[in-house]
């Protein structure tokens, strides 16, 4: 086994015993990144920074070293990294190098992590297939015939890099499923924490009331380790919760006897593939065999989640993206003679934003306009409150976690849905958006392969602030499923 194929937990042990140096581990990842160019996962590699950090980690080894000392990670391009290009995969931020570090990356570096570089994503995190990126498509390491498949989105580069062993783990962000859907498409683990568990400071904003950062890893244990380093109160983020961070790894007891797992009947969608239904049934059996009690529950407002999400998220995006005007940073359009400031705004935004971002800004501006605010935005906010209430009632009735499919299908081909009706693409988030609207933690765990040999995942949804319990349920599901398949290397 090459060092880059290790999990965080195994690498941590090997580093502690002196069987491996952080420099060797980092070099193995940098070699894999060079070989993995066809995946287009890393868009800004930072080998010099990585090796400097690895040497420092080796010097620190032993007492007092952080939980991630010497562990090489990939960072989604949405996180501001000081002095390193941070473009949110958009032409409008071309050449932008922040003068400050995001709270998440600061915490990772304090824990001793090594940054291998920045990862591909959908532009401004708007997309479900990593096809809206200014860097071009990220490619799923899993393949069927000669079709290039999507790794999912928006954290597609993160998912592809972890699944292909280019890094030990990666950061992602999740606004409507952008950690969990790509994790399911690539056979890895991805957790979206409770809204407010991880600081959003220094993460380029898409929809501020929905965005949440989280880890994308090779195992549930790794997710627990990485989340422990990322989480915590941050006075610089007013939505960050001042709640103690438990030892998530210590919570992985593997004992869920007597725990109640809810199965929401509304997630049985019309036209759902039989494979997804069968996988869901298998997941129920695995948790029941581990001693959990399986109960049917109702989340009656589920069917309104996607329409509400695609009003609220674009509305917040149109407000957040108003700051990109070519005045202070990023791209500025070349102006003609006689052009004024308004011409500069219009030309800069037309050149800098891709089609999907433009579409969502237009939708958002429309639903926030005076004539339509009550009909769309206010109504969507009311629906959001009802969706949250559905979950609150289920948890109040004693449910500890909720089991659902993660995605309505396995990974689809690049280009196959991009030209279709955008609504068809938006349906990829059908099982995940409710979790963001309610601010809950959710995790995707790989459980099996479909008939084509592509990975499928199940989602577990937890009580607010109970990532520890959620990770333990996911740990049980992961062990029972025994998913060890890896993509066959073609790159």
Curated annotation (Swiss-Prot):
Catalytic residues identified in the record: 76, 154, 178
Primary role: Allows the formation of correctly charged Gln-tRNA(Gln) through the transamidation of misacylated Glu-tRNA(Gln) in organisms which lack glutaminyl-tRNA synthetase. The reaction takes place in the presence of glutamine and ATP through an activated gamma-phospho-Glu-tRNA(Gln).
Ligase in keyword set: yes
Domain of life of the organism encoding this protein: Bacteria
BP terms from Gene Ontology: translation
Keywords attached to this entry: ATP-binding, Ligase, Nucleotide-binding, Protein biosynthesis
Protein's organism: Cereibacter sphaeroides (strain ATCC 17023 / DSM 158 / JCM 6121 / CCUG 31486 / LMG 2827 / NBRC 12203 / NCIMB 8253 / ATH 2.4.1.)
Pfam families assigned: Amidase (PF01425)
Family of this protein: Belongs to the amidase family. GatA subfamily.
EC number: 6.3.5.7
Record-level Gene Ontology MF annotations: ATP binding; glutaminyl-tRNA synthase (glutamine-hydrolyzing) activity
Protein name: Glutamyl-tRNA(Gln) amidotransferase subunit A
Catalytic activity of the protein: L-glutamyl-tRNA(Gln) + L-glutamine + ATP + H2O = L-glutaminyl-tRNA(Gln) + L-glutamate + ADP + phosphate + H(+)
């Amino acid at each position: 086994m090459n060092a880059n194929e290790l999990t965080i937990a195994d690498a941590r042990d090997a580093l502690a015993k002196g069987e491996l140096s952080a420099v060797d581990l980092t070099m193995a990842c940098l070699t894999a990144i060079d070989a993995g160019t066809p995946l287009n996962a890393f868009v800004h590699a930072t080998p010099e920074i990585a090796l400097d950090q690895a040497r420092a980690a080796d010097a620190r080894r032993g007492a007092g070293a952080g939980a991630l000392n010497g562990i090489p990670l990939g960072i989604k391009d949405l996180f501001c990294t000081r002095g390193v290009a941070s473009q949110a995969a958009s032409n409008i931020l071309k050449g932008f190098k922040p003068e400050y570090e995001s709270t998440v990356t600061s915490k990772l570096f304090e824990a001793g992590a090594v940054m291998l570089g920045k990862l591909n994503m959908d532009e401004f995190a708007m997309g479900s297939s990593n096809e809206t990126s200014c860097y071009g498509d990220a490619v799923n390491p899993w393949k069927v015939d000669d079709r290039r498949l999507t790794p999912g989105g928006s954290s597609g580069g993160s998912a592809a890099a972890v699944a292909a062993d280019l890094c030990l783990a990666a950061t992602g962000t999740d606004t409507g499923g952008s950690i969990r859907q790509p994790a399911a498409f690539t056979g890895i683990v991805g957790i979206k924490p409770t809204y407010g568990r991880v600081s959003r400071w220094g993460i380029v904003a898409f929809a501020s009331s929905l965005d949440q950062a989280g880890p994308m890893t090779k195992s549930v244990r790794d997710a627990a380790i990485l989340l422990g380093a990322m989480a915590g109160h941050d006075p610089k983020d007013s939505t960050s919760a001042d709640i103690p961070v438990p030892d998530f790894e210590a919570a992985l007891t593997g004992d869920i006897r007597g725990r109640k797992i809810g199965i929401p009947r509304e997630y049985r969608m019309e036209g759902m593939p039989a494979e997804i239904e069968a996988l869901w049934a298998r997941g129920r059996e695995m948790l029941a065999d581990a001693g959990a009690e399986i109960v049917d529950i109702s989340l009656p407002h589920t069917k309104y989640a996607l329409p509400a999400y695609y009003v609220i998220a674009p509305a917040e995006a149109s407000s957040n993206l108003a700051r990109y005007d070519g005045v202070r940073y990023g791209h500025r359009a070349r102006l003609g003679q006689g052009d004024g400031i308004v011409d500069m705004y219009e030309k800069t935004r037309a050149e800098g934003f891709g089609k999907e971002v433009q579409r969502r800004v237009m939708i958002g501006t429309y639903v926030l306009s005076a004539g339509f605010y009550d009909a769309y935005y206010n109504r969507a906010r009311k629906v959001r409150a009802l969706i949250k209430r559905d979950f609150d009632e289920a948890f109040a009735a004693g449910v500890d976690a909720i089991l659902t499919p993660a995605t309505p299908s396995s990974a689809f081909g690049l280009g196959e849905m991009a030209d279709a009706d955008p609504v068809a693409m938006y349906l990829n988030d059908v099982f995940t958006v409710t979790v963001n609207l309610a601010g809950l933690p959710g995790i995707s765990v790989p459980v099996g392969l479909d008939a084509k040999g592509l990975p499928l995942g199940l989602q577990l949804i937890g009580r607010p602030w109970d990532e520890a319990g959620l990770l333990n349920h996911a740990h049980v599901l992961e062990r029972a499923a025994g998913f060890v398949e890896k993509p066959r290397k073609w790159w």
